[in-house]
Amino acid sequence: MGRRFKILAFTFFIILPAEQRTLSQQVDSTSFKINPRFSFYSFESAGEILLIVPQNLFYSKLTVSFGIDGEVIGSWTGIPGKKMARIPVTLNLQPSEYILNATIAVSGRNVKYAANTHLIILKYKPNEVKTDRLTGGLIVNKRQFFPFGFYTYSPVHPTLPEEEVVKGFNMISPYQRILPETLTSRKAYMDRCAQLGMKVHYNLLSVSGGGGVGSLIDGLDNQSKKEWLINEIITFRDHPALLAWYIADEPTGNKISPDSLTRIYNLVKELDPWHPVSTVFMAPFMSSRKYADALDIVMADPYPVPVSPISMVGDAAGQLAAEFAGRKPVWIVPQAFGGGEWWEREPSLQELRSMTYQSIIKGARGIQYFVRQGLNLFPKSTAAWAECGRMAAEIAELTPWLLSDEETIPVRSGSQNIIITSALHDGQLVIMAVNKANSPQRADFSIARSFSGKARVLFENRSVSVNGGYFSDQLSAFGSQVYMISMKKENRTLEPWTKNLIKDPGFEDVSSPGVPASCYARSGGDRGATYFLDPREHYEGNHSIRIITPAENKSVRLRFFPFNGRNGGSYYISIWAKADPEQGLQSGEENRKHYFEIALGDYAYTRFELTSEWKEYVTNVTIPYYNDQPPRTNIILQMPSAGVAWFDMLQASESVDIYKCINPELKQ
């Protein structure tokens, strides 16, 4: 079904000083721009409008009132102080597409400013994907999402998704031709990705805007192409693995006009307004401006190695991020191939790291490498691809900061070869730095706030000293570093038991990015079952363990670091957990239960049913008095039901001391 929206007026009412309310006021409709923060709203009761302010008015006072059909829904008065002002609004609106009008008054100026855009309200769907125009990120399953994946070729090898998801990749984009006879194979990889929690950047090139590898279908007339496009969108628009529609590859190089691509875009959005549409651009990348009405996500594919400096990649990301700020997310396609055509060699693992981090530091909020064909075809270097997987885990760890909407604390670098950015999230400042040079560099950093203490060097299990806001470090050739500084004292949601027997109970040890430190893992029968740390969901601290079980009774089993048990002793075990029933291949099944099991060694286990909210689960296990097992024992966690769940703050204590254990206020 297509979108059928009633067009309604959504007006900003501006209160002007009496002396400025004259009939002779000039109207300027070009200086200010407005955009809803999200590409659409669905379940939210409140939203934000982004007001793009001209530079000469950054420090002018604006007075604004918001209303729909005369009803005021919000107001704002203030000095923006920067390019973008965030203005909250109430969204008590029915699904529709609204024309959003704005008039902006500037104190001391007898000029009325006007702007307009569209505000889209849709009925909520579990697989919907929003773009966040403020952060450049995505909202997937109601959570922040930083896409980090790769192109691949068709047919998709059956084991490819599971081989890559365990590294930390969360997205794939297969080149494919949309032929009726290959529909079964497309559905197969989509279903497998949904089981694994991977998303698919779905390639429609062969029946949409063209371009790309092997996308041409000989003899296909325009009418058939349109019919096949419509059928493909209808087939997969409700699929839980769908992330976005990819409709054109390098349109300038393939002589696809902006008008023709806009017509395709409008058709796709009419059929599926719940998912964004993307296009990839070749150099010159700023040609993408002409296609702004034909896409939701701007992508660029700079391939510099070995002829051009790799700073070309960061430069492209920075230019596009500046151009489309507040409007469109920017993704970069780093080069992960070489040795043929026009590219004499593929990038080294160091070059891949620098290109990737340059892109992200300069504003890219999606990474899609070109190209992956396993196990050692593209790229040929398994070490280079392992580095890409390592970065996938690192960026997953940094997602709350990269997609933070908090005002950051600026940080400067003392070297022109080192580019940096900073982000603030929940009182913790993250500083990302990357070396553009193929030689080691001393890095001197200054924070725009006086601070003395320690900065943790993430992913290296060390720290550096910060004195008065200044610190130094060494960056390897084309290397990157990430530093974290706690700017305020942590407010703990939950105090751990004083006699807790579990090491790293809150899963905060990130010595190896993405994986819990103090446990072993055992397969339950599916190689794609995962158990990553997730900084987006946690009951306390900064992390939980996210377990994804692809199919029933094929969960990974986590065996936590052992402790000494006592024959005849009883042990209380506690863990916090939640599930998301809307995710996974079977997400549409009504009344489907999610459950997990927790055990103490081989003595006993308890099964619990999960809910969609954080909840504490407690059990008690007694070790038999007459027992010939070794004294050391483990807590074992698994989730036999297919789906996704998060686990936090695992605790165990012998029940003889339980009152002292669970109340930190009680003394020995």
Question: Where on the chain are the PLM-derived regions?
Answer:
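Active-site groove signature of glycoside hydrolases
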Residues: 228-258, 282-288, 293-304
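C-terminal beta-strand-rich structural cap/linker in extracellular carbohydrate-active enzymes
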Residues: 467-496
